[in-house]
Amino acid sequence: MVCVLVLAAAAGAVAVFLILRIWVVLRSMDVTPRESLSILVVAGSGGHTTEILRLLGSLSNAYSPRHYVIADTDEMSANKINSFELDRADRDPSNMYTKYYIHRIPRSREVQQSWPSTVFTTLHSMWLSFPLIHRVKPDLVLCNGPGTCVPICVSALLLGILGIKKVIIVYVESICRVETLSMSGKILFHLSDYFIVQWPALKEKYPKSVYLGRIV
């Protein structure tokens, strides 16, 4: 009986420690000012990549190096990213010396894939996402809704929970989402440090979100 009580007390202490650890990480926003910030951008097929690149176009060279994460079968996004970086360098010669990298992970969900089966594909994607996040150790993760961003953001959160590095997660909901959040948005609303919406109707439904008007 005593052993059971001791084990229960130990388990309770561990649980309390983990809860406090998560709370501290989620609430901690202390970022040391630096000349540059490493940014990891999650790009998705179709309009997601177009929107996120428009947003990146307004950011300064201080966000460097830039790490892009795309699905392993998404060649269209890879081409758009390469074109964006080349155009950026042509417009401003100083951009020629900033570095960017493209990383690939498996898709969390293929087109027309059943939702129950996405549990396994997402876990597989997350299994490969954490080593990537651990290697890159970005200061900031920026995403706007592709399914690939879920395992990336969860991995970034785990990096902080484990005490390795606090990563700021910024989620920008797609301009196409006027009254309802995307599935990725519903998941990451509670995990991101800044959750940005582009329509006032979403701001009313989700008061904790940030509304800056249309930004892409």
Swiss-Prot record:
Changing P65L: In CMS15; results in a severe reduction in protein expression; loss of function in dolichol-linked oligosaccharide biosynthetic process. It comes from the Eukaryota. The chain crosses the membrane at residues 4-24. Part of the UDP-N-acetylglucosamine transferase complex that operates in the biosynthetic pathway of dolichol-linked oligosaccharides, the glycan precursors employed in protein asparagine (N)-glycosylation. The assembly of dolichol-linked oligosaccharides begins on the cytosolic side of the endoplasmic reticulum membrane and finishes in its lumen. The sequential addition of sugars to dolichol pyrophosphate produces dolichol-linked oligosaccharides containing fourteen sugars, including two GlcNAcs, nine mannoses and three glucoses. Belongs to the ALG14 family. Forms with ALG13 the active heterodimeric UDP-N-acetylglucosamine transferase complex. It comes from Homo sapiens (Human). Gene3D superfamilies: Glycogen Phosphorylase B. The lineage of its organism: Eukaryota, Metazoa, Chordata, Craniata, Vertebrata. Keywords: Congenital myasthenic syndrome, Disease variant, Endoplasmic reticulum, Epilepsy, Intellectual disability, Membrane, Neurodegeneration, Transmembrane, Transmembrane helix. GO terms for biological process: dolichol-linked oligosaccharide biosynthetic process; protein N-linked glycosylation. InterPro entries: Oligosacch_biosynth_Alg14. It is found in: Endoplasmic reticulum membrane. It is a single-pass membrane protein. Pfam families: Alg14. Residues 25-216 are cytoplasmic. Residues 1-3 are lumenal. The keyword Electron transport does not apply. One of its GO terms (cellular component) is endoplasmic reticulum membrane. One of its GO terms (molecular function) is protein-membrane adaptor activity. This is UDP-N-acetylglucosamine transferase subunit ALG14. It is linked to Myasthenic syndrome, congenital, 15: A form of congenital myasthenic syndrome, a group of disorders characterized by failure of neuromuscular transmission, including pre-synaptic, synaptic, and post-synaptic disorders that are not of autoimmune origin. Clinical features are easy fatigability and muscle weakness.
